[in-house]
A protein has these predicted regions:
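Alpha-helical interface subdomain recognition
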Residues: 1-89, 135-136, 211-373
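Serine/threonine-rich low-complexity intrinsically disordered regions
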Residues: 15, 32-35, 98, 113, ...
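N-terminal glycine-rich flavin-associated loop
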Residues: 41, 92-108
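Poly-acidic low-complexity segments
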Residues: 48, 94, 146, 165, ...
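FAD-binding core of flavoproteins
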Residues: 103, 107-226, 230, 366-373
Length: 373
């Protein structure tokens, strides 16, 4: 869980001091608090409000916000253990979305409100549009993460960013959920007013919430993938059949190796994208279009690994893995849900294919080989 790429892009396996501090803090918190009982209560419709207060007390929602704006001042790479741990422990909170929303607000020079924040990309998953003056929203959007739990929504329209109070009468909400029973609601906006408006400076990242949301999901997917690998290896070593652990069987070893390999590739792809995001938000040299490419690669790798891992881990566990009594479903239901959110692996593979066609064979190859990983 500690392999990193440093800010210079060198895979030295040594986390920064801030990354280590954040990782230790969030690991201790989730290991103690995200219990089977909490997850079962969440599935039964009870929000994890006490856990949310704990993450607030630890300063996690503002991890990506500059210290001058009241946050921790962490880079995307330094804050990545939070996203990873959300997935590893399957923490049922709008924490990843709040981190992203707060980061965008701070980047645009806007005040970050207290409380959970959801994020919306105008023009995606519906017909929601921001008016020319940037003061009102009209339209409908589906699959909004955690809308019922959030008072605030950050809506991006290319480089314009607005903060919206979801409790106003001009906004309607229809409840929905994903496979993991996480809130994925439908919102209707009828000339809804915006609380504040700002301007992003993320040139070439034309859909910032869509792209960075995909990066966030890729990171949480990697965390869940590593949890699934750990569960599969542990079960294969403990389950004895015909006098020896089933993990000794060659076919199972091959399955586990495939799953671990795909997980490792997804983790490295997300680390590269996190490095690019850190460069962009901290104003270091780098191409924003390179970040878009890196995010696409990360989401493709994470989505494909999720499909493979969910299948393999259930084969390893056999019938017991499909029971509600076993904890495996908390992880695999999130794999099935998150792989499609903010664009499926098929969507982002198409984006990569279009990039290759647009650049031509010589241009695309040069773009790959000239990049510093």
């Amino acid at each position: 869980m500690n392999t990193t790429i440093n800010h210079q892009g060198v895979d030295d396996g040594v986390p920064s001091e801030m990354q280590t501090m954040i990782a230790d803090s969030v690991e201790r918190l989730f290991a103690r608090q995200v219990t089977r009982e909490l997850l079962e209560r969440f599935d039964d419709g009870h929000r994890a409000d006490s856990l949310w207060q704990m993450v607030v007390d630890n300063g996690l929602p503002g991890a990506l916000v500059a210290e001058a704006a009241g946050g921790s001042g962490a880079s995307w790479l330094d804050a990545s253990p939070v996203l990873h741990s959300i997935g590893y422990w399957q923490a049922p909170l709008p924490l990843a979305e709040t981190m992203l929303g707060a980061a965008l607000l701070a980047h645009a020079g806007m005040e970050v409100p207290e409380g959970p924040i959801t994020v919306i990309q105008a023009g995606r998953l519906g017909d929601l549009q921001l008016d020319e003056g940037g003061t009102h929203l009209q339209g409908r959007v589906v699959n909004v993460p955690w809308a019922r739990s959030c008072r605030w929504a950050v809506v991006a329209d290319s480089q314009r960013l607005v903060l919206v109070d979801l409790r106003q009468a001009a906004i309607t909400l229809a409840a929905g959920s994903n496979f993991a029973d996480e809130e994925r609601d439908t919102l209707g906006f009828v000339n809804a007013s915006c609380q504040s408006t700002g301007q992003l400076k993320l040139a070439d990242l034309h859909e910032p919430v869509w792209h960075l949301g995909a990066l966030v999901r890729a990171c949480t997917l990697v965390g869940t993938l590593e949890a699934v690998v750990d569960k599969a290896v542990m079960y294969a070593n403990e389950r004895v059949q015909f006098g020896k652990p089933i993990g000794k069987q060659q076919v199972l070893q091959q399955y586990l190796a495939q799953m671990a390999g795909a997980t490792g590739a997804a983790r490295m792809a997300t680390q590269v994208a996190l490095r690019s995001a850190s460069d962009l938000f901290l104003g270091r040299a780098g191409s924003h279009s390179t970040l878009a490419f890196d995010i696409a690669v990360a989401k493709v790798c994470a989505g494909e690994a999720a499909t493979l891992a969910a299948s393999v881990v259930h084969q390893v566990h056999g019938a017991i893995g499909f029971t509600h009594e076993h904890t495996l479903h908390f992880a695999t239901r999130r794999l099935w849900s998150w792989r499609d959110e903010f664009g499926s692996d098929a969507h982002w593979a198409k984006v990569l294919g279009q990039s290759a066609i647009a650049a031509g064979s010589e241009g695309f190859w040069a773009g790959l080989t000239d990049r510093s990983l």
